[in-house]
Every structure is written in C-alpha cells, then in structure tokens.
Amino acid sequence: MAKLYFRYGAMNSGKSTGLLQAAFNYEERGQRVLLAKPATDTKGERDVVSRLGMTRSVDFLVGPDESVLEAFEHAAAERDEPVACLLIDEAQFLQRAQIDELLRIAVERGVPVIAYGIRTDFLTHAFTGSARLLELAHSL
C-alpha cells in the first residue's frame, strides 16, 4: 500500500530542496513524478523554488476550492506512463478536504504522496493543511 508522508520543518530548513532531490531520485531511476503546490503560494509562481536557487515547474497548481484528486488524475492522464510519486510543496496552504484527497491518492490509487510544509505560523498556530496532515499521514 502506498503511503501519505508529511515532511515538515522550519522555514529555511531545506524542504523545497528535499522535494527537488526526491523528484531527481525518482526520475534518475526512470520513474515519473508529478509536482504540485497550492495556487495561493505565489513564491515562484508555477515553480518550486529552493533557497539554493534550484527551480522546477509544477505539473499543476491547486486553488483553495479545487479538487487535488481531479487535478492529479488530469495530469496523470497526460502521458501513458504510471506516476510513481506525487510531491506537494507548501502543503500547509491546502484545505482539509484537499489533504483528505491526498490520502485517497495514496490509498486508493496506490501512488505515494510526499507533502512538504511547515506546521505552524509565527504565532505557533497550526496551518489547516498541516493540522490535517498530522492527523492523517502514515509517516512524519
């Protein structure tokens, strides 16, 4: 069974760099990955941007009222090649229902999902997406 993973850390701790490294590792083995992030994250527009200067375009953006599952299925269908992993940057900005859909992608579609983000804001209040990921993720 595929799992939902939540990789969290403080700002500037290398989460986006880790995501880009994970994508590279999958692709080096000839496996297809999809990258996504919330549309509300305006840093880099359609790119995942690491503080080391590495960038990569996402396969899809997800608005707060959009279905992650539908966006994933649409992007996955663009090529006749199975998706080995879905990588999500800035997952703290996703909504509860969208995190529930990430779990469905892992469990029902058999595609591992690795979500990267921060747990709390500067006032130590949990972000909606992070709180739900802490409840549902198979691995932290």
Q: Which stretches of residues belong to each language-model region?
A:
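Conserved P-loop
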Residues: 1-77, 121-132
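Catalytic P-loop NTPase motifs of RecA-like helicase/translocase cores
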Residues: 93-95, 122
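A short helix-turn-beta junction within AAA+ P-loop NTPase domains corresponding to the substrate/partner-engaging
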Residues: 130-140
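Conserved catalytic network of the ASCE P-loop NTPase/AAA+ motor domain
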Residues: 75-80, 105-109
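Sensor-1/coupling segment of RecA-like P-loop NTPase cores
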Residues: 105-130
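A short acidic, amphipathic alpha-helical/loop segment
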Residues: 22, 97-105, 129
